[in-house]
Structures are given as C-alpha cells and as structure tokens.
Amino acid sequence: MQTAVVNRASPASLNRTGLEQAVNVSVSPLPENGSTVQAVIAGMLVMLAGTIPRNILFAANLRYVPSLPWAVPIVAVYLWIFWRYLSGDGPPPETRAWRRSSLRANPLSARAWTLALLAGGLGIVALVLGLWLANRMVVLPAQDASELAGIPPLTVWSLLLVAAPIAGIIEEAAFRGYMQRPIERRHGPAIAILITGTMFAVAHLDFTPILWPYYVAVAAVYGMVSFLTDSIWPAIVLHTAGNLYSNTDLLLHGKAEWQASAGPSELVWSTGVDHAFAMTLAAFLVVSAGAWLAYRGLAATATTPATPPSGQI
C-alpha cells in the first residue's frame, strides 16, 4: 500500500512557513519511553498542528468563494508535508529517529492487515449499535447539518468527505502514535487507551461528559489494533472509514448516526423493552462477541513488523 510520505519541517523550515513553532514544540526529542505527560503533550500538539490549519482553510472556503472547494488541494498539500515531517523527514536530524518511531507507521503482512481490519471493523459496527442502544437509554446531544444549509452541495460534500481521511491520518498519528505508544510501554495498553481516549474526547468540539465512554470505546477499537500490530495504518483505514460513514450519514439524514436508528426514539425506561431495542441489543452482543474473537485472533498472530521502506507499507 503506497502511503503519502511527509517531510518533517524542522524548527528553521517551520519558522519560514509559519508551521514550525507549533510542530517544533510537539516533536522535541523525547526518550523512547518518555513520561506520560510528555506523551500527552506531544500527541496533542501534533493534533493541533495538523487540524488548526485545516479548520482555518475550511472556514475560509465557506466564507470566500464557497461555490468551489478550493481549500481541498491546499489542505492535501499541507497534510503531505506534515506527514513527511512526522515520519522523520526534514531537519533537525537529531529528531528524525524519534519522530519516525513515534509515528508508528510500520508495515504489516497481508494476514495482519486482514485480521486488523476484521477486528476493527467489527468493533466499529459494535460501536454504532451501542450508540443506538445508548440513545434509547439516555439523552445524547443532538447533532444536525442545519449549519450547512445554503452552502453549495459540491463544497459541502467535498469538504466533509475529504475531512474523513484527514482526521483519520492526523488523529491516529497524534493519539495512537505519538501519544499512546510511549504510555503503553510504561503502563500497558489499558491505561494508555484510557488516557488517549479521554484526550481524544477533549479534542472534539462536540464533547460532553455523557459521550466520554463512547470516545474511550473508540480509542479501544483503534488503540488495540495499533497495539497488537505496532502500526497505526489499520487504525487510519478504520478511522477514515468510520468518518466517511458518519459524515455521509449526517449529510444524507441531517442527523448523527446515533439518532438514525429505525426504532422508537423514546427512552426505553418509558416505553419498556420493545422489539427494536431487543433486536439492536441482540445484534450488539453478537457483533461484540465476533469482535472479541477477531481481536484474540489478531493477538495470537501479531508479529513485530519489519523496518518499513521509506514512504511505503
């Protein structure tokens, strides 16, 4: 699988481009097993350096010449440069090995790819079913596409669909790479996933405390795949697929996926356990069991990946 290789800009190059200061802080050399605080700071700075420019460009696109998605190619170029920098390219040479190791973009065998995507895919399906159940048990925050009204469809679809892989790449690099890897080496995957899941939740603008378990569950799906394969590539694919589903569902139905179940919208405490709730619960249990078995299979066959060729997996 060919990957977009990204040159890492060093403090000197970043200062010239206006990106350097943010990234330079996030990629200062850290020990391979640096402290939890260092890992959290590094991951959050990577996330901010990757998402803030995208958000600014997308907002500008919606305000200036909104009839054309002109921000898409600019963001794509920025992402390419940013990825290369995170993966070890560019100065300073003293941080190249640390950046490459922290990114965790290691190659995988075909078998590891298959099992990782199977386990993570079942995990995502279980998450969606779990959200449908949660929406019948508690009041989840509403999410709709009303703020996109009046924007040309070409621009809306282009920005939201392109946002899916961008978020997948940047957030996995930040949370499952730079942040999770050093924490799991010091404290194990459970604590690492709990911490990264919490920070993953805080990083989302729509976060409310009631959604914290959901974000930790998302971190568990992606984090365990990354831990068992020692690579963020499957998580990037899964994250992108999940975002594509969510964004497409939002545009087609005008509301979030957890509000789109076919059953009654009333809380189960008022309606009782109806047929829709029972069927969703049964599906959730079956899919969750399948995901658990798939993760066990992935754990049984996990191997240490070979050193990746430059820019490839």
Residue ranges and their predicted role:
Residues Q2-N33:
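Short, Lys/Arg-rich, polar N-terminal cytosolic tail immediately upstream
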Residues V37-T95, A112-A116, A278-T280:
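Alpha-helical transmembrane segments in multi-pass membrane proteins
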Residues A59-S67, A97-I170, R181, R185:
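Juxtamembrane helix-loop-helix connectors linking adjacent transmembrane helices
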Residues I170-I195, M224-S231:
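Membrane-interface helix/loop boundary segments of multi-pass membrane proteins
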Residues L48, I52-I56, L211-S270:
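Functionally important transmembrane alpha-helices
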Residues P189-H204, V216-A219:
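Small-polar-interrupted transmembrane alpha-helices in polytopic inner-membrane proteins
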Residues I169-A174, Y178-M179, I183, V202, ...:
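Active-site His/Glu-centered metal-binding helix of metallohydrolases
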Residues T240-I313:
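C-terminal membrane module of polytopic membrane proteins
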